[in-house]
């Protein structure tokens, strides 16, 4: 059976949202805004939010900071997963992962296909776990 198992009680979690971009600011971070709105609408808490430059060391530093925070349960990022030279978000996240959730990227691309067609092939979406944070 597909979908959400209604027999399992809902547990709200604290989520940090990272936008990876050299050009976005708080005033025009539409992707980050959308993530934050959907997280809140789903009943979770946006615990922290940051715009991080397309620089692997900066991404890793912020990610490690959030993973070390005892109240942050998950990190969701947007940006930097394409195939251009500046797209290094997956490499930064892989540097930090203790375990990769290998099926996440496949599921993400499958769901994205319905919206953007074959352009989904350009996404290198990834998921993993580090320090008990997803």
Task: Describe every region a protein language model picked out.
Residues 1-134:
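Non-catalytic beta/alpha edge segments that cap or flank active sites
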């Amino acid at each position: 059976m597909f979908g959400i198992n209604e027999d399992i009680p809902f547990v709200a979690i604290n989520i940090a949202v990272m936008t990876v971009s050299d050009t976005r600011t708080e005033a025009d971070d539409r992707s980050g805004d959308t993530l934050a709105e959907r997280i809140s609408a789903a009943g979770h808490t946006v615990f922290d939010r940051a715009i991080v430059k397309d620089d692997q060391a900066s991404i890793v530093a912020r990610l490690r900071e959030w993973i070390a925070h005892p109240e942050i349960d998950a990190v969701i990022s947007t940006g930097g997963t394409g195939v251009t030279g500046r797209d290094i978000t997956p490499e930064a996240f892989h540097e930090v992962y203790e375990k990769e959730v290998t099926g996440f990227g496949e599921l993400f691309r499958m769901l994205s296909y319905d919206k953007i067609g074959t352009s989904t092939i350009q996404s290198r979406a990834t998921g993993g776990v580090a320090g008990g944070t997803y």
